[in-house]
Amino acid sequence: MTELPPYWLRDNCPCAECRDPRNGQKLFQIHELPPDLAVAASTEADGHLEVLWSDGHRSRYPRERLDGTDEGDGRTERGKRLWTAADFAPGLPGASWEAYLTDPAEQAAVLAAVRDSGFAVLRGVPTVERQVLRVAESFGYVRVTNYGELFDVRVEPSPNNLAFTSVAIAPHTDNPYRDPVPTLQLLHCLENSATGGDSGLVDGFKAAAVLREEAPEAFEVLTRTPVPFVFRDRRTELRADRPLIDLDPKGRIREVRFNNRSTGTLRGSGLDAFYAAYRRFAEITLRPELQLTFRLGPGDCLVFDNTRLLHARTAFQQDGHRHLQGCYADLDSLSSTLAVLRRRAAALDTIAALFAGEGAAEYLGEEVTMAEHMLQAAAAAEAAGAPDHLVAAALLHDVGHFHGALHGTDLMQGQDNRHSDSGADWLAGWFGPEVTEPVRLHVAAKRYLCAVEPGYREKLSAASEYTLTVQGGPMDEQQAAAFAELPGARDAVAVRRWDEQAKEAGAPTPGFAHYRPLLAALMR
């Protein structure tokens, strides 16, 4: 590990002096590091590398931070599923709108399909106007263009774009005359009763990869020849000069811009080679095995990567109505939402593992296990009609027994493990104070209730009476008054009451999976 470049190591120091612990952003400028920076000493232990620097600074790196690989931004062909039409014979990727909205796993699967395969179809989106904006806003932000925040795809009397006619539209990407292009496009079908008007998709990355394999010289021409893409109407004039196939610095396909209708006049040398390559690429995109054709029905919303997929439409007769509404969005927000969903899912998996693993241990001498106790507390909160954040706090109030410096068994041996603080601190990585503060204060709430509520102490179980003494005993009058003024005191008292109810052997409760959607909705 110490063979890593010193400047790289120091630039990635994770300490609070170098990075803001709240957001991970650097607190120094690269030019502020000593020009002769060197490692003075280093040791490896417990999965960490500790470095003493020549300027006296100390850094401590987790091994996984040093061993990790750079996955990039997910925009290139690397890691994508390049496809042909036959790959979707079993069906198109997607989900019902209801499942997408209510199940984070379904939402993550849809967004992953857009990222990895380039598209997904949501079915059952209400067939009312402007719903396409709601779909875009479910994972990101609408990209407003000269067409507005949304546009209607239907026959117009004086169209400024062939998309607003009934003629066939060959495979293309949208808005190549913008820089940057809208990286996502959404099309929501409101009505489609006309004969014809089927939708088509072509994986532009796959087509480019085929060109690279069959005609590498043509591929190279299309990656290095800037093409003028132009759009003009009476209120707009747009132009962007970009190659048809754009590569990243490592030579991987990153973006395809292909729109015959918007290609301007190319000038300069090498025109014969360009047009031969252009024609070859166009012919590849029209190969039947690369063209995925399907029909959008009312309520279907197609979401696709406009930097990768070419979309098309067959001609349709005006013997019925065909009306789609579309809008643009961007991949960065979709990728961000997907990453957050996966991060939350990983956190929930960790919590679920606690319930299934350590949660099976006895609960401090009570007749229930740790998991049974917390599930009973959550069930009591739910039965009382408590808001979701308090159900979550009741469910998670004792996780600190697993994540403190001292285990729950230490508490029963006379050592205060401060599990309310360690649990709240651990949960703060995922939940806001509406969840964490009742967890943090639930032990104090027991001490408070014993001080101010006659008869409360007599209701405590033997184990709870013992831990009360270890945790400081009932509050005095001044402590109780101060506690009552705390912002989270009322919620903590509620959690405490459910805590005391949750010690009944064999009491039926929902499992952890029942609360998973509730927790997911509360996560930050």
Which residues make up each language-model segment?
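Motif-centric detector for short Cys/His coordination patterns
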Residues: T2-D103
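Short secondary-structure capping/junction motifs at helix and strand boundaries
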Residues: R58-S59, F119-R123, V144-G148, G432-R440, ...
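Metal-dependent phosphohydrolase cores
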Residues: A339-R524
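Active-site environment of non-heme Fe oxygenases that use a 2-His-1-carboxylate facial triad
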Residues: E71, T76-F119, G124-V303, T307-R343
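Short, solvent-exposed loop/edge-beta patches enriched in aromatic
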Residues: A45, S54-H57, R115-D116, E382-D388
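Residue-level detector of functionally special positions within alpha-helical transmembrane segments
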Residues: D20-I30, G118, H172, N306, ...
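Aromatic/His-enriched, Gly/Pro-containing loop or helix-boundary segments
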Residues: L27, L33-D36, V155-N160, T165, ...
